[in-house]
C-alpha cells in the first residue's frame, strides 16, 4: 500500500478483518500490519442502504476497486462492476474469489488451504509416505494478490493509453 496511492480497507463494523488477529494479541498481528501498511480503514455495513451508499460513493471516486465477495454478492448490493462502471467508466474492478466468477465451484467459498489442496500443491510438499501437507505460508493468497497486482497495473496502463476500465477475474485456485 505504499505505491503513492490512497488505499482503503473496508471491513465489517465491530469485527474488522479476521487477518488482524492472526498470531497477535487480538488487536493487530505483525502480518496484518505488514500487509495493510499505509492503508486507511473504514467500517461499512453493506446490510444497510446507507452503508451501500457510502461504499458506492467510494467506488465512484476510485481508480481501482478490489472485492472478494462470493460471486453475485456485490451485484445484489448494487456494487458490482456493471453498476460501478456505469457511474465511473474508467474503473478497474477486480473480483478475487476462491474459484472464479463462473463454473461449477464459483458459488463456493474458497480460502488458501482449499486452493492448495485442489491445486495439488499439498501433494508436492511434506515427506514421502506422509499425507498431503500444507505449504508454509498462505501461498495461494499471496499468488492471487500478486496476480491481482499485476493485472491491475496492466489495466491501468491500458486505460492510460486510451483504453477503458476493465473487469478482472482472479481466483485462488488458478493463481
Residue spans for each PLM region:
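N-terminal helix-loop segment corresponding to the beta1-alpha1 unit
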Residues: 1-167, 172
Amino acid at each position: 500500500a505504499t505505491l503513492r496511492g490512497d488505499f482503503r480497507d473496508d471491513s465489517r463494523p465491530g469485527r474488522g478483518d479476521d487477518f488482524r488477529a492472526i498470531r497477535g494479541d487480538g488487536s493487530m498481528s505483525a502480518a496484518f500490519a505488514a500487509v495493510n501498511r499505509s492503508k486507511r480503514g473504514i467500517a461499512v455495513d453493506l446490510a444497510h442502504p446507507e452503508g451501500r451508499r457510502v461504499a458506492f460513493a467510494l467506488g465512484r471516486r476510485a481508480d481501482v476497486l478490489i472485492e472478494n465477495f462470493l460471486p453475485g454478492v456485490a451485484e445484489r448490493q448494487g456494487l458490482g462492476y456493471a453498476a460501478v462502471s456505469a457511474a465511473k467508466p474508467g474503473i478497474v474492478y477486480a473480483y478475487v474469489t476462491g474459484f472464479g466468477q463462473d463454473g461449477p465451484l464459483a458459488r463456493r467459498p474458497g480460502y488458501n488451504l482449499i486452493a492448495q489442496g485442489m491445486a495439488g500443491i499439498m501433494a508436492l510438499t511434506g515427506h514421502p509416505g506422509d499425507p498431503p501437507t500444507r505449504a508454509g505460508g498462505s501461498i495461494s493468497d499471496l499468488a492471487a494478490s500478486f496476480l491481482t497486482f499485476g493485472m491491475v497495473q496492466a489495466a491501468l496502463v491500458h486505460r492510460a493509453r486510451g483504453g477503458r476500465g476493465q473487469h478482472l477475474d482472479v481466483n485462488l485456485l488458478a493463481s
